[in-house]
């Protein structure tokens, strides 16, 4: 038995098996492993010299040569009965880094083949200051295997083929898509129960338009996910000028718009260098988001247009509004603005996030929008590192709204520069005035086991309007390193 296992482990080397990462034939067999196993059982049972009856996905990617098909079958199912696996690569951190190519076909279909992709925990390099702060805690989320939902599977490698695949396929593999300028990857017409898998590197032509949305997604019972080694590259460096959505050249304001999405999942995506806000999530119910890596590290550096400031600005990770029963978990964000910002919605859980370099975990700003009610939001088991704020609730002056039942629990802060806990009701035109108003009611707010350190600023800052704040509870809260704390509510003062 041991001898058989040992031989099996050396079989790929002995056969000279190609890597699925670099060879389209091996990749096609790896991606469609179930179909490959069925085909190879027949193909290797007898001597076959013709290419008739071979599934198109294998034929086209194996150069229409029976010897390539035979070799791929021989290499299928080695040590563990699955296709030979290659070492997973970390997400690319620059636009010049290409990642695992998927099958080089334009729009290949196979019927009723659930496709499974495997991903594992990976790391990307942090800046020196981040590594010094919490190197051991900067592990990226493990990304679990995913599967399609049956039905027709389409592999798309050309932007022009996306719309037809969305209309006719229940499983869609978007492989190394290059979306031309002013061309949205439109996933709003997905079939109920559809699955979309991003593979390779997804790129976009430069579009200097604040109303342009590079990716738009909607649907019911939909799964959006990513294959091992993929990256969705927003090409933010082409737009960054230190001003974000506050001025400068026009740039896409929202990179990925998720709207009208019900009972669906977004998981295991690697997103790099988005221009301004990354996710705009609106009008969803029972949406689950998990295992995402949002890496805007490159935006920390100044460029020729940013006048010495970080080039990226207003790069919120997740902006959530008018959404109910949403769960966001197990994700990693390095950006230059809010890690998460909830401006309206109910029954929202944000759990196990790692937030670096931005403005923390936020409610708001509330007021002056079409919907100004937040009810039932929990931030839990998360870290906010080297950011301006830790936990923040803010409302706009001279507006109305409600913020009810918000809990921050088991939150660790480190290297916070402005406010550890911050509740303000004095925002006007995007800035604080120091004069709070009471049109937005903030009630039933709790902080439980929120601890950490400041690099500067105030540990606690609470500025409520007259009578507009009530029932704040602080349990096991301990933030140190700041100075000049100021709290006008509760009457007992700061924690």
Swiss-Prot record:
The keyword Lipoprotein does not apply. This is Probable endopolygalacturonase D. Keywords: Cell wall biogenesis/degradation, Disulfide bond, Glycoprotein, Glycosidase, Hydrolase, Repeat, Secreted, Signal. Its EC number is 3.2.1.15. Involved in maceration and soft-rotting of plant tissue. Hydrolyzes the 1,4-alpha glycosidic bonds of de-esterified pectate in the smooth region of the plant cell wall. The keyword Thylakoid does not apply. PROSITE patterns: POLYGALACTURONASE. One of its GO terms (cellular component) is extracellular region. PbH1 repeats lie at residues 261-283, 284-322, 323-344, 374-395, 403-425, 469-492. The active site is at residues 337, 359. Gene3D superfamilies: Single-stranded right-handed beta-helix, Pectin lyase-like. Disulfide bonds join 154-169, 339-355, 464-469, 487-494. It catalyses: (1,4-alpha-D-galacturonosyl)n+m + H2O = (1,4-alpha-D-galacturonosyl)n + (1,4-alpha-D-galacturonosyl)m. One of its GO terms (biological process) is pectin catabolic process. SUPFAM superfamilies: Pectin lyase-like. One of its GO terms (molecular function) is polygalacturonase activity. Glycans are attached at residues 295, 371, 410, 444. Residues 1-16 form the signal peptide. InterPro entries: Glyco_hydro_28, Glycosyl_hydrlase_28, PbH1, Pectin_lyas_fold, Pectin_lyase_fold/virulence. Belongs to the glycosyl hydrolase 28 family. It is found in: Secreted.
């Amino acid at each position: 038995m041991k001898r058989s296992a040992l031989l099996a482990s050396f079989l790929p080397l002995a056969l000279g098996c190609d890597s699925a990462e670099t060879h389209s034939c091996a990749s096609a067999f790896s991606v469609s492993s179930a179909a490959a196993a069925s085909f190879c059982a027949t193909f290797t049972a007898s001597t076959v010299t013709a290419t008739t009856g071979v599934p198109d996905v294998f034929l086209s990617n194996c150069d229409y040569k029976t010897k390539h098909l035979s070799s791929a079958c021989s290499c299928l199912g080695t040590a563990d009965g699955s296709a030979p696996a290659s070492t997973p690569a970390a997400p690319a951190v620059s636009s010049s880094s290409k990642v695992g190519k998927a099958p080089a076909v334009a729009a290949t279909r196979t019927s009723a083949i659930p496709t499974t992709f495997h991903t594992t925990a990976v790391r990307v390099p942090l800046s020196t200051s981040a590594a010094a702060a919490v190197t051991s805690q900067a592990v990226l989320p493990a990304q679990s295997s995913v599967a399609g939902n049956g039905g027709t599977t389409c592999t798309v490698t050309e932007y022009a083929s996306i719309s037809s695949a969305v209309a006719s396929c229940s499983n869609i593999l978007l492989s190394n898509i290059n979306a031309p300028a002013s061309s949205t990857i439109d996933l709003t017409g997905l079939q109920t129960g559809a699955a979309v898998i991003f593979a390779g590197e997804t790129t976009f032509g430069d579009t200097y338009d604040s109303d342009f949305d590079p990716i738009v997604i909607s649907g019911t019972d939909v799964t959006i996910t990513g294959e091992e080694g993929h990256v969705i590259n927003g090409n933010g460096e082409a737009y960054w000028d230190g001003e974000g959505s506050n001025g400068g050249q026009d740039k896409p304001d929202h990179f990925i718009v998720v709207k009208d999405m019900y009972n669906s999942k977004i998981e295991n995506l690697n997103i790099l260098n988005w221009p301004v806000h990354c996710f705009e999530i609106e009008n969803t119910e029972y949406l689950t988001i998990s295992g995402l890596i949002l890496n805007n590290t490159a935006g920390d550096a100044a460029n020729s247009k940013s006048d010495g400031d970080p080039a990226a600005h207003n790069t919120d990770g997740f902006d959530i509004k008018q959404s109910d029963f949403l769960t966001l978990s197990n994700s990693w964000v390095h950006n230059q603005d809010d890690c998460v910002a909830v401006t309206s919605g109910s029954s929202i859980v944000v759990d196990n996030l790692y937030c670096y370099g931005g403005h923390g975990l936020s409610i708001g700003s509330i007021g002056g929008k079409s919907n100004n009610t937040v009810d039932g939001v929990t931030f839990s088991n998360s870290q906010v590192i080297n950011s301006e704020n830790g936990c923040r609730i803010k409302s706009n002056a001279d507006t109305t709204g409600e913020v009810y039942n918000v809990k921050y629990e088991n939150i660790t802060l480190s290297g916070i520069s402005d406010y550890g806990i911050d509740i303000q009701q004095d925002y006007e035109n995007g800035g604080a005035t120091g004069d709070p108003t009471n049109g937005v009611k903030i009630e039933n707010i709790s902080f439980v086991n929120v601890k950490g350190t400041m690099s500067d600023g105030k540990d606690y800052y609470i500025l409520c309007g007259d009578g507009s704040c009530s029932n704040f509870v602080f349990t096991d809260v301990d933030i140190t390193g700041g100075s000049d704390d100021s709290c006008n509510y509760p009457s007992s003062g700061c924690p």
